[in-house]
């Protein structure tokens, strides 16, 4: 069965993690000095490496031959965790196991010492989805954990995690990745997979990933499959259903020229309903805003506004100024 690229190229060591050096360096230092907290909370938006780092940390604390905090990936413990056969390292999806009964079972099992590895590790993903009663049940075991127990919590919505849980965890804030960091990783994966890809296409995919490495790799996977291994800028537009920056520029030019007919022609011919204007860059153009108004209404008195028929093009800054002044 085909393995998705984001799974195939998931980081296996802290050194493989892209763009989260402050987090990985701290974890490696704690592992080397033996000062790792019994409970860690990873927080960030999707696709930034929270779950990957949690699994790497689970391997690192149980690795028989660690290297400066990184797991070796070759010992029986590392291999069992990678294969998902280690019964002492459990990944729990709080979205589907958010009740108090699930947490009580976890709490009761946590007191037993691990059978095959040094530390029993619970990775609770999307922990903010737990119910209030479940959080209360979890609080006691996090407050007074056995020496063999490690909790790694991950969330995309930190504000929903109770303060009583937050105060008992070490927090690690993962950052959104820069486009150049994502592009570098995409180029590496493309080289490994013998995918020919244009630099412009890589840069576009990196921007569309919106700070998430997993999204970027998934987009590359989708485009490479559709383009039979040769990814161009145009093939990315076609594969992802994007309007394209050139088409968007043509629309902007027509609006600036007050050519309503041309603008509408481009809009309806180049941007069918299935096309995503948001991802093509339209939403990132704050200079112009199209608004419908009655033909008989007075013109908008804003600097540099353009009025043609029933379409008015106004600078976004001017629009905000009118709203704030009550105009």
Describe the residue ranges of each PLM region.
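Low-complexity, glycine/proline/serine-enriched flexible coil segments
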Residues: 287, 305-308
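Extended, largely alpha-helical regulatory/partner-binding modules appended to the mid-to-C-terminal parts
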Residues: 23, 80-87, 105, 118, ...
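P-loop/Walker A NTP-binding region and its immediately flanking N-terminal helices
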Residues: 1-171
């Amino acid at each position: 069965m085909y393995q998705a690229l984001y799974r195939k190229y998931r980081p296996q060591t802290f050194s493989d993690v892209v763009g989260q050096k402050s987090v990985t360096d701290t974890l490696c230092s704690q592992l080397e000095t033996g000062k790792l907290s019994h409970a860690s909370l990873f927080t960030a938006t999707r696709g930034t490496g929270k779950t990957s780092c949690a699994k790497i940390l689970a391997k690192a604390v149980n690795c028989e031959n660690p290297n400066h905090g990184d797991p070796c990936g070759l010992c029986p413990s590392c291999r069992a965790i990678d294969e998902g056969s280690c019964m002492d390292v459990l990944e729990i999806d709080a979205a589907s196991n958010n009740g108090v009964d699930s947490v009580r079972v976890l709490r009761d099992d946590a007191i037993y010492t691990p059978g095959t590895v040094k530390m029993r590790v619970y990775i609770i993903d999307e922990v903010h989805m737990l119910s209030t009663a479940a959080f209360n049940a979890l609080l006691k075991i996090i407050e007074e954990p056995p020496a063999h127990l490690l909790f790694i919590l991950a969330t995309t919505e930190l504000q929903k995690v109770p303060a009583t849980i937050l105060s008992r965890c070490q927090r690690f804030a993962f950052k959104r990745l820069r486009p150049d960091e994502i592009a570098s990783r995409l180029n590496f994966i493309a080289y490994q997979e013998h995918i020919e890809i244009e630099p412009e296409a890589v840069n576009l995919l990196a921007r569309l990933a919106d700070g998430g490495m997993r999204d970027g790799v998934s987009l590359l996977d989708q485009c490479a499959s559709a383009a039979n291994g040769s990814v161009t800028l145009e093939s990315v537009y076609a594969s992802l259903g994007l309007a394209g920056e050139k088409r968007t520029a043509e629309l902007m030019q027509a609006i600036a020229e007050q050519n309503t007919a041309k603008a509408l022609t481009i809009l309806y011919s180049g941007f069918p309903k299935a096309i995503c204007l948001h991802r093509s860059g339209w939403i990132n153009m704050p200079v112009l805003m199209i608004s419908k108004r009655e033909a008989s209404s007075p013109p908008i008195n804003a600097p540099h506004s353009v009025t043609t028929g029933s379409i008015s093009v106004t600078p976004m800054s001017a629009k905000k100024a009118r709203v704030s002044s009550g105009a």
